[in-house]
């Protein structure tokens, strides 16, 4: 089995579409609560953005006051990040290899949606161990991932109605979803991963969940929620060293 960490956004057309996306609709819920979550759990100002893509989350962290390095496996996405943010620090990490970054140097490692595309338990564990190596003694990992519910419901920014096979998917299976906020409507292929599966990954990687958040849409927000008011499309794990 090929277990290399690949990225659908190496595709030129898809990376072009994704690079124009900000934080609308369902994506708003992924980032709405992060300032408060990070403020509660993270002490220090150095951060690494793992899977930074076009750099939106990297700039988000900088706006929160962090000195941040954005890393990604996709050169096309990094090129867009550098074009959008010429002053940013963006680095290529082939296959997610983080050995070029200093150990024990970062107070926060943010991973926003990256683990949705990592194919196996072993690869997830290895990458989390790599992120753990980067942390200061009191550093935290914030792992933002798609909930299993996102692949079997309709959302302001996503559709899964054309993929009934998603309902039979188990932890580690491929699932399909369409992004509605970009011109490129080809299905995105993700890897379904359950809460139970993530907790096993964390135990094997030597990190422990400190808090888990499942953000819901609220009345009065500037979006027409579909499932978001009752079902969380995202799960946000705050992780620390297990020692």
Q: Which residues does each PLM region occupy?
A:
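Conserved class I S-adenosyl-L-methionine
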Residues: 1-42, 56, 60
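Nucleotide donor/acceptor-binding cores
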Residues: 44-46
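C-terminal lobe and adjacent flexible extensions of AdoMet/dcAdoMet transferase-like proteins
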Residues: 205-243
């Amino acid at each position: 089995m090929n277990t290399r960490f690949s990225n659908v956004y190496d595709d030129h057309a898809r990376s072009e579409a994704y690079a124009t996306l900000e934080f609308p609709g369902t994506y708003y819920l992924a980032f709405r609560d992060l300032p408060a979550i990070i403020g509660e759990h993270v002490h220090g100002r150095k951060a690494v953005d793992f899977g930074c893509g076009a750099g939106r989350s990297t700039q988000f962290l900088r706006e929160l006051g962090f000195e941040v390095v954005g890393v990604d496996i996709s050169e096309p996405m990094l090129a867009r990040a550098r074009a959008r943010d010429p002053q940013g620090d963006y680095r290529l990490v082939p296959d997610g290899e983080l050995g070029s970054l200093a150990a024990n140097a970062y107070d926060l490692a943010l991973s926003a949606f990256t683990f949705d595309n990592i194919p196996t338990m072993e690869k997830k564990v290895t990458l989390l161990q790599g992120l753990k190596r980067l942390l200061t003694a009191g550093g935290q990992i914030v792992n933002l991932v798609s909930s299993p519910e996102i692949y079997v419901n309709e959302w302001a920014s996503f559709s899964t109605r054309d993929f009934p096979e998603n309902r039979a998917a188990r932890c580690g299976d491929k699932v399909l979803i369409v992004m509605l906020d970009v011109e490129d409507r080809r299905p995105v292929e993700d890897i379904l991963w359950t809460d139970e599966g993530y907790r096993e990954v964390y135990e094997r990687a030597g990190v422990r969940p400190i808090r888990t958040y499942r953000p819901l849409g609220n009345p009065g927000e500037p979006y027409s929620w579909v499932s978001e008011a009752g079902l969380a499309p995202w799960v946000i794990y705050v992780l620390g060293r297990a020692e």
